[in-house]
Amino acid sequence: MSEAKRIKTALVSVYHKEGLDEIITKLHEEGVEFLSTGGTRQFIESLGFPCKAVEDLTTYPSILGGRVKTLHPKVFGGILCRRGLEQDMQQIEKYEIPEIDLVIVDLYPFEATVASGAEEQAIIEKIDIGGISLIRAAAKNFNDVVIIASQAQYKPFRDMLLEHGATTSREERRWFAKEAFAVSSHYDSAIFNYFDGGEGSAFRCAMEDQKQLRYGENPHQKGYFYGNLDAMFDQIHGKEISYNNLLDINAAVDLIDEFDEITFAILKHNNACGLASRPTVLEAWKDALAGDPVSAFGGVLVTNAVIDKETAEEINKLFFEVIIAPDYDVDALEILGQKKNRIILVRKEAKLPKKQFRSLLNGVLVQERDLDVETAADLKQVSEKAPTAAEVEDMLFANKIVKNSKSNAIVLAKNKQLLASGVGQTSRVDALKQAIEKAKSFEFDLHGAVMASDAFFPFPDCVEIADKEGVKAVIQPGGSVKDELTFQYCNEHGVAMVTTG
C-alpha cells in the first residue's frame, strides 16, 4: 500500500447521523480515538464508546449560538500539520496539538432549507462555516488525512475499513479528497445560486471567463458564453461573435474534425449545406459551394486547410458570416478582411472537452462526445451485392455528414461531394424526398450516388425511393426489427447496403 497511514484520531461532527454507527463501531475496534462536538459526541457516547469534546481540547465552549465550535488552531493545526515536515511537528508538540488523521463531517442542509420555503434568516443560518472549513483543510492535507465529507462516502469508507482496517493508502486519501472538493464546490454553488436567483436548485457550471453576447438566440433574450474561446480560436477580424454564430461554429468544428483529407464545408443553422473533400482547398471550396449555392448565402465556412490567395478570391464572391481555418496566407487575409463585419477565425489545436452538456427541464444532460469515426473495417455488409471500393469511400464520407446533421437526416453524396441532404424532418421518407428534390434542383445526377441515414430504416420505402433515382449503395446503422425487409429489397434489386450499428 503506497504511503500507508494509520488512523489514530478521528474528528467527527455531522448533521446527519444515519449510517454512522457502523463506521464508528469499526473505528473503535481498530483502536481509533474520537473527538467531537455537541450532538455527535452524544451519539458516539450512546454507542458505548468514549469521545473527547472539542471544547476540552480548545478550552473554548461553543459560542455565538453554535456558529463557532471547531474554528480553533488546536483543531485545524491537528488537521493541517504535515507529518513529514519537522517544523510542523515541532510546533504542534510545542502547542500540545494532537494529530487528527480522519475527519468525518457533513454540511448543514442548505438546499433543503431553501426548498422548504424558509425565511432568509433561517436559510442564512444553514450556511455552514466550520464544516466547510474542516472539509477544505482535511482535503488539502490528504497526504496525511482522510476526509469523509458526506453520507455518500460512508459506504466506500466502510468497505475500505472492512478490507484493510484503519490503514489508508495515498490513492485512497486522494480519492476522498477529490470527492470532498466536489461536495464543497456544489455547496458553494448552491449558496451562490440562492443569492443570485433564489432558486436553490439551479445549475452553475464550474467555468470562468464569462463573455456577454450581443443577445441570445433572439434579440429579446440575453446571452452569455462561459468558457475560454481564446483557447480555441484567434479572431483576427470581424464583429463580435453572436450566440447563433457560436452554435454554427460548434457544429462546424464537430463536422470538420471528422475529416483527414482536405475538406471544405458550408453550414447553415448547424447543418452542412455544402461539403467536399478534394486534393486542393480551392477545389474543395468550389465543389462544396456547388452543393447548394443558394443556402450558402450568409453561412459559416470551415476548412481544415490553409486558405491561399486564389481560394480567398473565390470565397470573397459570397456573402458569409464566419470563416474558420487553421491559417491564412497574408494575401488571403487581406482579401477576406475587406468586409469589416466578416468574422475570421484561426482554429487552434486545443482539444474539445470529452463530455457534452445540454440543459433541459430543470436539469442537465451529460454524455460522452462521439469521437468514433467509422472505417471500412467497421462496416457490415448486409446485402448480397458488395459495394465497390469507390462506393465504400463515398458511404464513409456521407456517414460523417449525416452523423453531424439534425435528425431525421438523409445525405446523398457522390465522389466525396455532398449532393444534397434532408435534415430535421419528422419523417425519414420526407427527409429523403427533400434531399432528392434539392439535388435535382442543382442538376446533380444521382446515378452512382450513395445514401446515408442517421438511423435505421423501419421499412424498405426509403431504399426503394432512392433506388428508383439511381442510388445503388446505402449506409445506415441498422437495428430495426424489420431490417430483413430492407435487406431483402436490396437483394432483389441489386442495391449494396452496409450497417454501422
State what each model feature region is.
Residues A152-Y328, A332-I335, K339-R369, E391-K400, ...:
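Active-site loops and adjacent core secondary-structure elements that bind or stabilize anionic groups
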Residues F320-A325, V330-R342, E464-G501:
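C-terminal binding/interaction regions
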